[in-house]
Regions:
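Primarily membrane-embedded glycan-assembly and transfer machineries that use lipid-linked glycans
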Residues: 2-182, 210-340, 399-400, 426-442
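Alpha-helical transmembrane segments in multipass membrane proteins, preferentially the mid-helix core
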Residues: 307-312, 340-356
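Aromatic-enriched
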Residues: 70-78, 350-457, 466
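Membrane-interface alpha helices of multi-pass inner-membrane proteins
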Residues: 181-205, 327-334
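Hydrophobic core segments of transmembrane alpha-helices in multi-pass, intramembrane catalytic enzymes
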Residues: 161-170, 195-198, 215, 342-351, ...
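Juxtamembrane/interfacial segments around transmembrane helices
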Residues: 69-71, 169-175, 192-199, 245-249, ...
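Active-site catalytic microenvironments for nucleophilic, acid-base chemistry
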Residues: 87, 204, 351-352
Length: 466
């Protein structure tokens, strides 16, 4: 095993500094929770709703109205999983249609607590092992920023199944497992937990990994059928109908709805809404400008990712596999809003990149910035009284208009644009240097012919994967 080259001087001090800032944000969030009774912004603004995604989903895993009453977008696997790792008697079936009926189980279902936090710790160990395998020098800083950063902490506070799906994602696409079949299973599990993670699978076709994609799709279908047979509900039509309905409901009606997000969808909804006087606050000219400028930036970044995908198809052997996956994943995540915690997915792949080239360096630094659990207040709203779960009492909460909801989606877009441009540059340089003389190096994927060029391409891909 060769010793990795020493990282450039900027990386030696900058990454530890950024990780230290992330640690400071974690300490501040913990201090605020202890002294004020709730987590500060940018965490969710309802202090009583901690772990709500886990325990409400666990309740509806037992209520037959999962898809027609609660209108969930989760495939059956999520509910089967929560049935297996929860106490049945903690979830008596309630009358009515209370979407938060599972919150009462938080004081009873201790296996749920243990499972959620166990997967959180498992993720920390997995990402450290993966990054140590790639570059031991930067591994501690990147692993800490990802495992203890804002996206993962937000997922933990919400009790969202991103914590479990993330485990499946890193085992499917990280370098820890050697068995391709086992990787297929974890890829199928990840998709059955979070449907949009299919965007991490299809980019493998750009690298001509036909059998890998076929195996993962078969595993996905088999896992779905088994979980559907267990749960007894959750047909593809029900899931698709609920996803379409959910997308129609996304938006913002007040400034508090501009919370922790990955895209500008909520802001655009608020700008175009007649329920909130944004024109009176920033002026009609600025509103009209933002309604044109923000979509233009989004479309530009989406086009750059598509162009990068085309470039990968032409020169698949010169682009690292983790970046190929990330391009498809980021295209999905910037196109449809799925929550701020989903940033953990693409940050995982960004931190696999080497500290080389302006675009990649920017993406790495920006990923650290997204991991900082802090925000900058711009203005203050009136204090309100809210119930809190820790402590079990009512508290006075001061809400602020923060900078984060306006800046974080832009940082996400710059990361996507940076890796797209870095990919286009890599392909362009290879085309100028080598022309088309070795274009048959991937021919064995189509015909049973192995050439020296094909072997060279496979070796280069393996080196990139390491």
């Amino acid at each position: 095993m060769t010793t990795p080259e020493a990282p450039p001087s900027a990386s030696r001090w900058l990454e530890p500094l950024l990780a230290l800032i992330v640690a400071g944000g974690v300490v501040w969030a913990g201090y605020h929770w202890i002294t004020e009774g709730f987590l500060p912004q940018p965490f969710f603004y309802e202090p009583f709703d901690i772990w709500a995604d886990w325990f409400n989903t666990a309740y509806w895993a037992r209520d037959p109205g999962t898809y027609d009453t609660w209108r969930t977008i989760y495939p059956p696997l999520s509910f089967v999983f929560l049935q297996m790792f929860g106490l049945e008697h903690c979830y008596p079936i309630a009358t009515g249609t209370d979407p938060s009926a599972g919150l009462m189980a938080r004081g009873c279902d201790w296996p749920g607590y243990v499972t959620l936090h166990a997967f959180f710790l498992i993720n920390a160990v997995l990402v450290y092992r993966i990054y140590k395998k790639i570059d031991p020098r930067s591994a501690p800083w990147r692993a800490f920023a990802l495992a203890a950063g804002l996206p993962m902490l937000d997922g933990l506070e919400r009790g969202n199944l991103i914590i479990v799906s993330f485990t499946c994602l890193v085992l499917a696409y990280g370098p820890l497992l050697r068995s391709a079949r086992l990787r297929w299973v974890f890829a199928g599990l990840a998709i059955n937990f979070k449907v949009y993670l299919i965007a991490a699978l299809f980019p493998l076709l750009l690298r001509r990994k036909w059998r890998w994609v076929e195996g993962a799709l078969v595993a996905t279908v088999m896992i779905y059928l088994l979980s559907y047979a267990w749960l007894g509900r959750g047909t593809p039509k029900e899931i698709v109908d609920n996803i379409l309905s959910f997308n129609d409901q996304l938006g913002a009606a007040q400034l508090l709805d501009l919370w922790y997000a990955t895209t500008y969808r909520a802001l655009l909804s608020l700008l175009g809404s007649s329920n909130f006087p944004m024109m009176d606050i920033i002026g009609s000219r600025n509103v009209d400008l933002l309604l044109v400028l923000i979509p233009a930036i989004q479309y530009t970044v989406q086009a750059s990712l598509i162009a990068a995908a085309v470039a990968i198809w032409l020169r698949p052997e010169v682009v690292p596999l983790y970046r190929v996956i990330n391009i498809g994943l980021m295209l999905a995540l910037i196109t449809s809003e799925a929550g701020g915690y989903t940033q953990a997915y693409f940050i995982f792949f960004i931190f696999m990149e080497r500290w080389k080239g302006f675009g990649i360096k920017w993406a790495i630094v920006a990923a650290y910035v997204l991991s900082i659990p802090l925000d900058i207040p711009l203005d203050r709203s009136l204090p309100v009284v809210r119930p809190a779960y820790f402590p079990n009492t009512t508290i006075i909460v001061n809400y602020y208009i923060m900078l984060g909801p306006f800046v974080r989606p832009l940082i996400v877009l710059t990361i996507a644009f940076a890796i797209a441009c870095a990919t286009l540059r890599t392909v362009w340089l290879d085309s100028r240097a080598n022309g088309w003389r070795d274009r048959w190096r991937f021919a064995p994927d189509v015909t049973p012919r192995v050439t020296d060029a094909a072997l060279d391409g496979q070796a280069a891909a393996s080196a990139d994967a390491r």
